[in-house]
Structure formats: C-alpha cells, structure tokens
Amino acid sequence: MTKTQVDSGWWGFWRTVPGDLSLMVDAVLSSDRVLDGGRRTIARMLMADVVPQQRWGVFAPESRKVHVAAKNGWGPLPDGYRLNSTGWVSGADRDYVLSILSRSTAGFSHGRRTVNEVADICHSAMADGLA
C-alpha cells in the first residue's frame, strides 16, 4: 500500500487509492499472507455481518447468489462527503475484490446512491448481473 496516508484513525478520512484498498482486502480476506484460515474466516464473517443500514456499496445489489465481505467508510469534509466501499465478492463464478472511493458535494444520501450505482455497474461487468 504505497499510496495510502492515514491522517486519523477514522476509516473515511484515509487518503488512498482504490488499488491500495483492493490489495489490503485481497491480502486479508483471500490469501494466507496476513491471516491463517481460521482468522480469515472470522474476518470474513465480521465484514459480511453488518447492519442493514450499512449494506451499500460493494454489498449492492443485494444477492443471495454471492458472499460479500466489505467495509464502508464515510464522513463529512469541507468540500463534500467522502464515501468509501471496499470488499471481497465470491460465489456464483465470482472471486474478486472491489474498491470504490467517492466524494459527494450533494451529501451522504446522494453519494451513497452513486456508490451503489458504481457497484452495480462493476458487478455486472464482472459477470452476468446479480439481480
């Protein structure tokens, strides 16, 4: 992760690029480089079992066909809301990491819709749509 700068402990305020986040998720969730099998399973469970209000971004569109383990981050800054979603998608002939970073000058709700739309486009591009 050569292009990531952590200015505070709050996930939404990291300065990074999608490639770095994807490398991190891949290292933690889909290989033995960081976590052994048991710990990786726990991390996947924790990142998959989130409250419904936080099931957006990489989680969208909701589908029973695939397993998604993701982390979303968001927060207000003077020039707009930052909304990040990164995670691992597996099942139904899929196995990939997706990271989406955004800035919304129109607020959280607009940013969340935009991130969901980008996720939907990416999921569809990776294979047949999930709907």
Predicted regions, residues:
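Penicillin-recognizing serine hydrolase domain
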Residues: 1-131
